[in-house]
Every structure is written in structure tokens, then in C-alpha cells.
Amino acid sequence: MVRIIDMECSVPYGVNAESKPEKPEKAAAEGQPGYGMANYGRIFRARREGGDHRPAEDLDAYMKHLATVGIVRSVPFGLPNAETAALMTRFPGRFIGLARISINEHHGMAGVRELERLVREEGFGALGVSALVDCLPASDRRYYPLYTKAAELGIPVRIYSSMNYANDRPYDLGHPRHLDQVAMDFPELRIIGGLGGWPWVNEMVALVRRHPNLHVDTSAHRARYLGQPGSGWEMLIQFGNTLIQDKVRVGLSAGLVGQPYETLIQEYLALPLKDTVKEKWLYGNAARVFGIA
């Protein structure tokens, strides 16, 4: 059986009765329907309706299902930090905590202290930065204290790197070009460009090739489209099978794309990649960047 580290796992709600995550629609701007973050609900609702969703009380069965299909570790998506910490406590060794620090909520050193607390006390394994949430590009200097602390702690940072659908903010906040300056300024920091840089895939691949410390994941996109001519992913498939084969990680995003894990895994196994490369994409590369033996 293949082993998989899922870079974006939609965990069933209700891990902690005192804290429940909000769906993207909840954060929508008031006023015009379908505006701002609510636009995600309009675009992705049909996909989510068919996903692998399970009731909160079935969380143990959900975890057994992940093990059955070969998913040995997952990065929870869309959960507050407290919820992620509860997951890691309940299922030791099954989750990699992504410390989501919004500089809109944690100003200056407050964010730095919170990141250190999450890593040292709660066992989080990475920093998460989102231009979509903060409405700031990753190269904004207000993030630099967090990057410095992440490098000091020896943890990677995963940065939102894609076009966003929140139509109340610039569409290119997550353009891969913003990673270039960060990678130059922090050569010791392991950086993961999340969501593959779509639709600027060529630029993402070029930057991953340029910077030894820059990596990419495929979250929010189905593998069946990565291998289709004309999809815009041709360069990732070509270079991901050769020159950057050690720098690509897989995010299944089952809850977002609305397909069961078995289907999504088989789509990756069907990609025109060498068998040794498939193992790297699915497990080996993520294990290395997160320091998993």
C-alpha cells in the first residue's frame, strides 16, 4: 500500500465541543450575496456536496478510514489552532499542526510569541501564512518576524500561493512572485508554496527550481486535471517528474473537491510520473520537509 502525507485534510467538524470551525461562507462580507469570501461558497458548493464528509461523532471511524487508504499523516485545513491542537492530542502522530497566525489578529511580537507557544507547548510542526485571509502578499515585511521565528524554531512555513476567489480583494495577492523575495531574504527557511501557484504554475515551477529552500504542494486541485493537456499544469508534471521531483507535495483536499479519498489517490497514481516520483510526491518529500523519519 502507498503511504501518503496529505497537505490539506478536511477533518469532520466537532473535534472539540467548545470550539467549532467556520466554513468559508461564514466569513463573508455583509451585503451583496456571493461577494467576498462568500464567493467561495458559490464556486465550490457543488464540489463539497459530494465529498467525504462524516458526522463529528464518527471521527474515530474517519481516522480508521484514513489509515485504510494509506494516509499516515495529515495537515488539518480550516480549523482554529485550538481545534488542531485537540486533534493532535486525541490522535498522536496522525496530524501535523499548521500554526495559522493572522497578523490582523496577532500584531507584532504577539504573533511571534503565539507561534513559539504553539510549537513548543502544543507540538505544531509548521507556520501557516495566508494572503487570502490577511489581504497582504507574503513578502509584506509585517510577516518577517514570523518568518524569523519559524527559521529559528526549525519549522517550515506554508504560504498561500494561488489566485483567490474572494472578489473583494486583489486576485493576485497569492502570486508566486511574492515568494521570491521571502526565499531570498530567508535562505534557511523551508517554504512551501501552497495550492501549486495556479494559474501561475510556470512561475511557481521556475521559482521552485531557482530556490533550494522553496517547495510546492498541489492542494485544492484534482490530479486528474494536472495531467490533462491544456490545463496549465504541464510544466509541473514535466519538471515535477525530473528537476524538481524532490520538491512537490500532495494535498488531496477531499472536502473541497468533493471526492472520496480512494478516487483522489488513484488519480495521483495514474499521473504520467515515474513510480519513484509518485512515492516522493505522496510521502517522501513531505516527510523530509517536516522532519518525519
PLM regions and their residue ranges:
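H/E-rich (His + Asp/Glu) clusters that bind or coordinate divalent metals
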Residues: R190-I192, G196-A293
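Active-site environment of divalent metal-dependent phosphoester hydrolases
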Residues: P12-G14, A82-E83, N104-H106, D134-C135, ...
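Active-site gating/metal-coordination segments in enzymes
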Residues: R73, P80-L173
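A structural motif corresponding to the C-terminal end of an alpha-helix
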Residues: K64-S74, F91, L153, D185-R190, ...
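Mid-to-C-terminal alpha-helical segments outside catalytic/metal-binding sites
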Residues: V2-S10, G14-T68, I244-K247, G258-A293
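Distinct, well-ordered alpha-helical segments
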Residues: T84-T89, G108-R117, A138-Y143, D168-M184, ...
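Hydrophobic faces of well-ordered beta-strands that scaffold small-molecule active sites
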Residues: I5-M7, S74-P76, I96-A99, G125-V129, ...
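Glycine-enriched alpha-helix->loop->beta-strand junction motifs that scaffold or abut catalytic
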Residues: E122-A126, L146, E152-P156, D185-L189, ...
